[in-house]
Amino acid sequence: SSTKNKDKKRDKDAHSVKKGNQWHFGYKAHIGVDKDSGLIHTLKVTAANVHDVTMTSKLLTGEETVVYGDSGYLGAEKREDAIITNHSGKHIRYKINRRPSQMKKGSARSQAQLKRREHEKSSVRAKVEHVFGVVKGLFRYRKTRYRGLRKQIAKLNMLFALANLILADRPCLAA
């Protein structure tokens, strides 16, 4: 339950969201990760009911030429607040993974090409998941311990900064 505290009150800043058939109550961390180094450059913490695509423009630094994301970011380039060009005036390409149901259209050959492209996108996007793996696995951060968005932001800023230190200390796997 979301009210396991002394006051028997819910956190006013946290919200519920349904993912699949499972309900979650709390917060969501949206992160921007550098494609080459795998280090976090941006962290935004919101209530769990805030959709990923609404945070896209807040996660970009302005230096990007390509943006990768999971299917939660579909349509990010079409939004009013979308950043279309970076600081140097170059067009930003959005490479967002499709939903599995969208990959069933077309011939077998086109499906094979589509599957290969989606795999390439996922291999770059996996660097984001590695960061969450460090925070959840190494630091055992699986649920919130504090009430209030400000406390969550402080806690997650510390955890993701420590994750950056750990990831920066590891030898580069791509080389």
Regions found by a protein language model. Name each.
Residues S1-T85, K90, N157-A163:
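Polybasic low-complexity intrinsically disordered regions
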Residues T61, T65-V66, S71-R150, A154:
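Helix-centered, glycine/charged polyanion-binding patches within enzymatic domains
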Residues S16-V17, S101-K105, P171-A175:
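Short, surface-exposed, charge-dense and proline/glycine-enriched linear segments
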Residues K6-A14, G20-N21, H30, N97, ...:
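Residue-level detector of intrinsically disordered/flexible regions characterized by low predicted structural confidence
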Residues V45, Y146-L149, C172-A175:
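Composition- and surface-driven signal marking solvent-exposed, interaction-prone regions
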